[in-house]
């Protein structure tokens, strides 16, 4: 249990970071709302349920890159379970005597076992992705040299975001796992329901810093989540929450179906707010995995088109100018900031990018 001072400090931290995060999400709503009307809410409840099931089973992720998708599933299922873990850790911090460690209750034993195993799976998954991005450096992450990119993207912005989130996950999950080992060491006992934490717990038997270690690891695990909240609306990892919504907003029409002829004297879109709101929302949901340009025949043949770069450029420009865009003081010129005219005319409208996209 946290001290009274720590409890108050945590509540204040949640309040401050919560307000900052709310402002970020509010800007997203305002900017997306500036788009043209697009009726995507018919049968929305049923479509959202289907989207949640598809996401829960990782069906959209496993459409390609099966090995990568397995490691993604480690993180997804682990983090999904960690919602319960974080709730439990909050209860431990604020309710005297609350703990699942040492309990003989079947639910507590099952919770401890899954917490322990999922901690390892998440750590294995995130280490795999960090090695893949920073050591393996697969060619699929590269853009053709003639593809238009926002300056921050060209300077490695995606890699920096991936590194920051990777470090956050390792510290969050690793600290929680280590804190469990400290709790076991405090009791000088191993438990079968926490096999991996029990392996390292004996290393800390009799250590005088266990109480401090338990508090430090709690703050690293839980405090980092709260501190990360204001950054979340600007990170590509916001897709965790937005992907199911985007899948539910997907058009019921078949991919590749011809659009109705337009009577507009200015068809198409020159600025961000000329796009339907769904196309603005897409830029927030994009995970920047580049699966789309991996299957794009135009990109693979060396043209300046990258479906991934289009969404990434939109997102980076929005992130850097969100206040002005939300306030109506600035417009995003798509041909200047997001895509070149040559890239537009390189598109074959084959819809391969849409078919492979794991987030709709």
Regions found by a protein language model. Give the residues of each.
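Membrane-embedded alpha-helical bundles of multi-pass integral membrane proteins
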Residues: 1-270, 275-277
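Generic structural hydrophobic/aromatic packing signal, biased to beta-strands
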Residues: 25, 52, 127, 165-166, ...
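Short, well-ordered loop/turn elements at secondary-structure boundaries
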Residues: 70-75, 159-161, 234, 282, ...
